[in-house]
Amino acid sequence: MSNYDSIFIKSLRWIQKWLVQTIVVPHDPLTDLNLDPSKPVVYVMKTESISDLAALSGITANFGLPSPYDPLTLDKVSIARVVCLEGRKPMIGQREGGEKFLDSFTQLLALHKQDKQLDIQLVPVSLYWGRTPGKEDDTMKAAVFERENPTWLRKFFMILFLGRHNFVQFSNAVSLRHMADEHGTDKSIAHKLVRVARVHFRRQRKVMTGPLLPNRQALFNALLKSESIKKAIEEEATNKKISIEKARETAIVYLDEIAADYSDSLVRITERFLTWLWNKLYSGINIERAEQVRQLHHDGHEIVYVPCHRSHMDYLLISYILYYQGMVPPHIAAGINLNFWPAGPMFRRGGAFFIRRSFNGNKLYTAVFREYLDQLFAKGYSVEYFTEGGRSRTGRLLAPKTGMIAMTMNSVLRGIERPVTLVPVYLGYDHVMEVATYHKELSGKKKQKESLWQVFGAIRKLGNFGQGYVNFGEPINMQNFLTEQAPEWRAELAKDPEQKPSWFTPAVNVLANRVMTNINGAAAASSVTLTSLILLASEQNALERTQLERQLDLYLNLLKKVPYTPFTSVAQGDSQQVVDHCLGLNKFISTRDALGEIISIDPKIAVTMSYYRNNIIHLMVVPSLIASCLVQYEVRSRSEIKAIVNDFYPLLKAELFMGIADLDSYIDDIIDLLIEEQLVEESAGLSIVESHISQLWLMAQTVSETLQRYAIIFNLLAHKPNVERADLENDSHLLAQRLGALHGITAPEFYDKKLYNTLSVKLKELGYLSAVEKQVDVARIRDHANGLLWSSVRQTIIDSVAAEHGH
C-alpha cells in the first residue's frame, strides 16, 4: 500500500468514524460461521466501492479477520484480499465489465491447482447503507437513493443520511479447495462461481430489506377486486338489505382496521429507542439458532413466526432481535385491544396488523382478513402470530387457538408457490413486567384494559430485569406437514376454497399441537427458572446455599448431558454463578446464621415465582417422576420405572406439550446420569445411595402436585367408571380445592379448570372414560399415583373421594 493510499484511507476512516455506525451480522463471524483462522481468507463483495471497503476495514480487526487492504501473499504472489463481482458505477456511462473479476476467480482456482495443500476461504460480505426496501411506486426517491447500483454521488448521500444504519453481513465461507477438488479449476468453474455469487447477493439483499412495500390504497383496491371479497360484499348486501356500495364501504373499514402500514423510517427510529430500552431493562439477550432462520429466508421460504406469549414486550423483542440478526421484522397479528392511541398507530407502522378476538360469524370480516393474510404471503412478507391467543398467566403454555393456523393452512391450499415454514419461538425472561398483575388476575381481580398509562407505568418501573431469552425452535414446513397428514392434499388446490376437506380440521389440530410442542422443545433453562424450580420443591421454599448449589449442579449436568431436545438451552456458568446472578436480581432472599447462608423465596411472592418454574417444568418432569419412583415407590428396576412413566406420559404430554421421541431411551439416559452422579447404584437392581437421598427427594417434589391431580382423577374414575366428562372435570376441580386448602397448595395451575378439561379430553381419547374394559388400567394407574404420594396427601384424596361418592 503506497503512502498516498495509506493517507487517503486513514482520512476516509476518520470521516466515516463520525458518519458511520456499523452493525455486524452475525455478531461474531469467526465463531458463528466456523471460519478457520489458520486458512487464508478472501472476501467476495458485490460491487467495488471505496466506502464499502473502508467500512469493512473498520470492523475486521475487532473479529480477528484480515483487513481488506492487506493483500494475500502466497509463494511470493500477491493477491487482492477482496474480489468484487462488479466495478464502480461512474456518473456517466457504463460500469466496468465483469472480465476483471472473472479473471480474479480464475487466478484463485489456478493457485489451488498448483498447490494441493492450499485452501482459501471465500467469505461473501454484503454491505447495506440503510435497509429501506423501497415501495412499489417509488420514483424520485429511488433515483436519489438507488441502493444496489449507486454512483459515487448517490453513495455520498446514502452515507450522509443512512451512515448510522450501516449493516455488514458475513456469510458462510466457500472452500476453494473443495471447489477445485470436486469441480476442477478451469474458467467455466470461475463462471459458475460468479453466477452463484450473484444469486447469493440478490437473495441476501431480500433477506435484509424484504420485498417492496405496496401503496396502502393500491393494496386495498387490489384486495377489493378479489373474487372472495366481492362475493362476501354481495352476501353482506343481500343479508343486511343494504346497497353494494354500503357493503363495500364496510369492507374498506375492515381493511383499514386490519392492515399494517409498515414504515422503515419509524422502524429505524424505534430500533434506537429499543436499544436504549433493552440496555436499561436487561443485562443481555441470549439468542439461539438465528442462523437457521436466516438460512430459511435465504432459501426463499415464507416464514411464519409462532412464539409463545409471556408479555407485551414479546411484540417488541422479536422484531428487535430479527432486525439486528439481519432479517426483516415480521408483520405481527396483534389483538385489537392494542389498537389504542397513540400506541396503535405506532404498532401499525411497525408492522402490526390487527385482529379481533372473535369473528362472530362475520363472513365479510373473515373474507377481508383471510384475503389480506393471503396477500402478505403472496408478496413475501414474514408474518408473526401468537397461537395461544393471549398471554399466559401461569407460565405454562396455553392451549392453542387454531384460527390463524387454519388460515395459514388455507393459504397454502390456495396455491402459494414458495415453501411456507412455521418457526416456533420460545421467549423467556428473568423478569416479566406483568407477572404481579397476572397473580392478581388469577386471584380474581378484573383484567385492566390496555392503555397508554399502563405503558408509562411499566416504563416508570424500569430496573434490572436480568436477561431475556429468544430460542428459535424446530421449523415445520407446511407443505411437508400436509403431505404427511394428507398425501392427496395438492388435489385440493383447484377446488373451492370455501369447501374444507374432511382431513382439514384434524390436521390443523395436529399442527397447532406440534407448534406448541416445538416451542417447549426450545425452552431456555435459565438461572431464575432453575432456581425457582428447586426452591419451590423444597420445604418452606428455602435451602442452604451449598445444598442449592449441589442441586443446581445436578440439574445443569442433567440438562446438558441428557438434553430434552437439541433446541433447548441451559444457563451458562456453574451453580455458584447461577445463584449469584439470581441474588443480583433481588428475586431471592439471602440470610446468614452461624451455620452458613440460606437462600429462600419471600413467602409473599412464592406464587408469583411459580410462573418462572412453570416455564421449564416440562424439562424436569420425567427426571422428577423417575426420582419419585425411586424415593416414594421404592421401585428397583428400570422396566418398572419405564412402565410407570409410560402410564403417565400421555397425560404429561397433553398437559405440558411434551414431545420426547424415544421415551424409553430417554429414561435410560436419565438413570445412567443418576448413576454417574452417584445418586443411584445398579447391581442386581437399582438402589439409592443413602448419602445423596436428599437430592433425589428434592428432585421428586417437582412432579408431586401433578401426581396429586392425577391421583384425584384416577381415584374418581375407579370409583365411578361411567362418570360423564363434565362431571369428572367438576369433581376433580372441587377435590383439588379441598386438597389445596388442607395441604397448603397455592400453585395457580392446580386449580385451573382448563387444565382439567385438557386432561379429560386426553382421557377420553385414551379410552379411559365410560369404558368398563379399561378398569384394570385405571386401577393400575390409580395405584401408581397413590403410591407416589405422601401418605397424608394420599389419605386425604382417598377419604374425599369416598365421602363424595358415598363409599
Swiss-Prot record:
GO terms for molecular function: glycerol-3-phosphate O-acyltransferase activity. It holds the Pfam family GPAT_C. Its EC number is 2.3.1.15. InterPro entries: GPAT/DHAPAT (IPR022284), GPAT/DHAPAT_C (IPR045520), GPAT/DHAPAT_LPLAT (IPR041728), GPAT_PlsB (IPR028354), Plipid/glycerol_acylTrfase (IPR002123). Pathway: Phospholipid metabolism; CDP-diacylglycerol biosynthesis; CDP-diacylglycerol from sn-glycerol 3-phosphate: step 1/3. One of its GO terms (cellular component) is plasma membrane. CDD domains: LPLAT_DHAPAT-like. It is found in: Cell inner membrane. It catalyses: sn-glycerol 3-phosphate + an acyl-CoA = a 1-acyl-sn-glycero-3-phosphate + CoA. HAMAP family: Glyc3P_acyltrans (MF_00393). PANTHER family: DIHYDROXYACETONE PHOSPHATE ACYLTRANSFERASE, GLYCEROL-3-PHOSPHATE ACYLTRANSFERASE. Belongs to the GPAT/DAPAT family. The HXXXXD motif is essential for acyltransferase activity and may constitute the binding site for the phosphate moiety of the glycerol-3-phosphate. This is Glycerol-3-phosphate acyltransferase. It comes from Shewanella denitrificans (strain OS217 / ATCC BAA-1090 / DSM 15013). The gene is plsB.
